[in-house]
Amino acid sequence: MMPVFTKRLELRTDAENDILDLTGEVQQAVEESGLDAGVATVFVPGSTAAITTIEFEPGLARDFPRMLERFAPKDIDYEHQKAWHDDNGRSHVKASLVGPSLSVPFEDGILTLGTWQQIVFVELDIRPRRREIVVQVMGEAETESRS
């Protein structure tokens, strides 16, 4: 049976389009797992937030929300809002485009991310939120018999 380690992260967001770098926390979960090689999955429960990778720098932190706005603009009618009257139909659409999870392989206990690639959480709801992020690490521990 493959070992599984789960860690939960608690986040608070201030506004729509908050982007938070989770790379350090995910790497820490890999280290805490004691596993040598495998995959780390990062997942956000809910339908108005997303997990992805990006070069986490100020320019892209502004560009990414603007790109999402083109796919799901504020100024159109969303059927979701007619049903729920919560004004966040666009939040659900954006979140479904980006997705709620990401899996990253690791080797020798280190995430195999590119030099300019960070794991980020993206808040897409229209109000501040408390979020729980689930990091699940699966893999193999290094053994002396491995060659």
Give residue spans per PLM region.
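Active-site histidine-anchored catalytic micro-motif
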Residues: 1-147
